[in-house]
Amino acid sequence: MRFLSKFFSLIAFAMFCTTIFSANAEAAPSIKYRVTHVRLIDQGELEVQGYFENEGDRDAYAKCITLDLTLIADNGQEMWSNSGIEHYIDVYVPADGALEYTFYVQDEEIPEYHGKFRYRWHTHTNWDTSAG
């Protein structure tokens, strides 16, 4: 009888812990901006094309993209590089969804270049669950 009492107490405690800890595992958004193409517009300006992807299970708003970008000429020479480029926005991204987004970077150091080039990038996206 004593064993049965301990067994049921253990089961009740396990159910209690499961209820408490599962309530804390709240749904959360996870938004990332991915660069798909970089295009040189003119000397001093480039266009960054990409999309936001929300891998979470809750809707949210992308607030800021921080971009590190390096342009590399066809011959392997670095043409331009900048890190910490911030672009502030307020864009709705649905849960498990994606949204195309293009923005422009202006910097007098961006060269005018008409040949082929490649690019390396890294982004960090800040988001919030409310607009504004």
Residue ranges, per PLM feature:
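Bacterial N-terminal signal peptides
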Residues: S9-T19
